[in-house]
Amino acid sequence: MNHQKERMQMTDASVVSGALSASAEWAAVDWRLVERQVRRLQARIAQAEKTGKAGKVKALQRILAHSFSAKLWATRRVVVNKGRRSPGVDGVLWKTPEEKWIAARSLRARGYRPRPLRRIYIPKKNGKLRPLSIPTMTDRAMQALYLLALNPVAEVRADPNSYGFRPYRSTADALGQCFCVFAKKCSPKVVFDADIKACFDRISHPWLLANVPMDKAILRKWLAAGYVEATVLYPTEEGTPQGGIISPVLANLTLDGLERVAHEAAPGRSLVNVVRYADDFLVTARTPEILNEKVIPAIKTFLAERGLEISEEKSKVTDIETGFDFLGATIRKYDGKLLMTPSRKSVKGFLDSIRGTIKAHAGGAFRELTRLLNPRIRGWANYYRNIVSSRVFTKVDSAIFDAMVRWMRRRHPRKGLSWLRTRYFRSSGHRHWIITAATWKADSSVSYTDLFQASSVPIRRHVKVQAAATAFDPAFRDYFRKLRKTRTQTKAADHTGSFQASAAARRSRQHQPGRVTAASGKA
């Protein structure tokens, strides 16, 4: 009776008001109420899973998956994310409010048949191509809907030190845990840097169907949907499709338990730690023998049960004094002191990409090149802002500066340094040779766009999430509220500092008469 009452509460039209057109209905949705209703039931699912009430978990999941609030929330996720402009095999996109409302109303399990995924290939950093499978909008929304019901269970079951594709967790948290593991004098000396061979493509379908706590009929249809490449339909007999909304959580559920297996293989003072981000993980121990004879064999057995295996070519046992790369960072101890820096591979890949963009923009406007580079430099620097990166940032700035100067000289082979300085540079306080692009406005004023410098990003220690904290557990509600506030304040402080620096730069530029002549045109 209580479940029936909850179903009525979750599926009524309280999130909108009155009898309106489809477009008006979508515009009238109270999204705060929708989110509150969904989050409330997700918390109950997490609590039921935490206390081992499997029957209640299943009943609450069904209520959530059939609720209109969840259908609205799932539809909204699909139409606002960055993949909203990429259609599936049917070529359909939901662009108008009317289409979005009708889509939300049409999401139901009865009679649902997913379409094959559209297979495309995107370039990887190493120049190779990575397959990406794109579901239809309807299939994406259905995955998002059932993910709302699956995620609370996945969070409760998750390994404490799993940091990929989980709420409030990121690579910064994973690297923060690495610091916690290795920074002490009595920290483990030996590391197993592991790589799983084609993890997403090889996960066992029978294992998923037997162990993933969701509607098995729906899951079976997704796994068997296949994909279309060049008008040819290919079956999928293993793996989760890379590109599906629910795929990362399925992969996490597959690998959850690995941390427990590692600890059970070598109990006591073995100094075993596991840090995992999706399918990228490392395991520590006191000696190589503990890893090679106990932990690694146990992990291989664990993975084999799921259709997976360790890549022997890409995995290795090393020590912290030699160092290793993890999530784009080099982690190494020098004379007992732990240093985490951007890896050489990451720095080289980033600079190669920047130089390639500069070279490809040989005939374009300088201001457009600057605007193209700035978000990439800022994003790369922000990724590494939580580790020892200041020296690397300075070197990166120098390399980009040299590449830009070469662009200027190729563009103006007959112009001297004084002319180039007037056209492309400015000074501010003690800083000289700041690369900047000028744009003339309609009122004859000039605006400037400086080339972003990685070294302007302040280095700050990341506030790492507690390993035991799970996002949907009511017991951690206050903790996550404080964590959000702390992280928001840190971002706001950084933004304020950046804004003040920009304002000072603008004031400095106002006192540089005659700095620009025709720099606003195509350089």
Spans of features found by a protein language model:
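Extended C-terminal regions of large enzymes
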Residues: 397, 401-403, 408-503
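Short, solvent-exposed helix-loop connector elements
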Residues: 131, 235-240, 339, 355-369, ...
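A conserved non-catalytic segment of reverse transcriptases
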Residues: 224, 305-372, 376-380
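Intrinsically disordered, low-complexity and often Lys/Arg-enriched segments
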Residues: 1-32, 36, 450, 464-523
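Charged boundary/loop elements
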Residues: 23-83, 148-164
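Phosphate/adenylate-binding "loop-and-lid" substructures adjacent to NTP/NAD/dNTP-binding pockets
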Residues: 57-126
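Conserved polymerase palm-domain catalytic core
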Residues: 106, 110, 157-169, 173-323
